[in-house]
A protein has these predicted regions:
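A short, aliphatic-rich alpha-helical micro-motif
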Residues: 16-17, 37, 80
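Class I SAM-dependent methyltransferase SAM/SAH-binding core
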Residues: 31-77
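Conserved alpha-helix/loop element of class I SAM-dependent methyltransferases that forms part
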Residues: 2-20
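A short beta-strand submotif of the Rossmann-like class I SAM-dependent methyltransferase core
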Residues: 88-91
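Conserved acidic residues
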Residues: 20, 41, 84
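A short acidic, Gly/Pro-enriched loop at the edge of an enzyme's catalytic core
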Residues: 76-86
Length: 92
C-alpha cells in the first residue's frame, strides 16, 4: 500500500533501524512490523488486541519467525529485553 510505504520512508529518514532491535507498540495486524523487518535485526510488535496479534502471527512469513515476534500487551512495563528503537504509530 502506498501510504504504508510513504510512512516507512518517513521513518527511515528519521530513524535508522538497520541491524537494530525494534519495539513496535500498537503493531495491529503487523503491516508496519513486516516493513520494519526488511532492515531491522529483530522486531517485537505488541498490541492490546488479541485478534490483531493473532492476524499478525498468521501473516508472518516462515522466514521471519525468529526475527519477528508478536505479543499481546494491555499495559507496558519495563521491557525484558533491550531495544535500540521504539516506534508508536497509528495507535492514538
Amino acid at each position: 500500500m502506498y501510504v504504508d510505504r510513504l510512512e516507512l520512508d518517513t521513518v527511515r529518514e528519521l530513524v535508522d533501524v538497520t541491524g537494530k532491535r525494534v519495539l513496535e507498540m500498537g503493531c495491529g495486524d503487523g503491516r508496519f512490523t513486516f516493513l520494519y523487518a526488511e532492515d531491522a535485526a529483530y522486531v517485537l510488535g505488541i498490541d492490546p488486541k488479541r485478534v490483531e496479534v493473532r492476524e499478525a502471527r498468521r501473516a508472518r512469513a516462515a522466514s521471519l519467525t525468529k526475527r519477528v515476534k508478536f505479543r499481546v500487551a494491555k499495559t507496558i512495563g519495563p521491557p525484558r529485553r533491550r531495544f535500540d528503537v521504539a516506534l508508536f504509530s497509528w495507535s492514538l
